[in-house]
Amino acid sequence: MSYKQDHLNQAMNERTHSWDPPLDIAKKLLNLDKDDRRKLFTELKPDSFGIGSLMGFTKIEIDEKGQASFYCKPEEYHYNPIGSVHGGLAATLLDSCNSISAQCNLDKGLIALTTDIKVNYLSQISVDTGEVVARGKIDKLGR
């Protein structure tokens, strides 16, 4: 039996997700100062925005300095074809927490976008790893 035939005979898993309209959050963000941005992101449910829902983020924390922590419990749907969690999950967690940390440290009317990201993977992530946490810390805001 070929892989394709064997694969077609197996039951497929399903997962659904929902999210709030992302532009609603973005429009609010532009009109908020640093303190109100921190409050907005502290109150934001991790599954209420598209990427948080899609990737299965479980918790967001924002400290008094605006540094963000994003949490996720790896699940089977995060796996790649070689049997480990896809590296994109770690990269997305890092990008998300760094972005939110930046937003929480910007003045009203400004937003920041990621222009570059480099991830060095130190070990494999699997469902056995348990909850993973990414923490964003802003050392310097650039232009």
Task: Please give the residue ranges for each predicted region.
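Terminal targeting signals and extreme-terminal segments of soluble enzymes
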Residues: 1-143
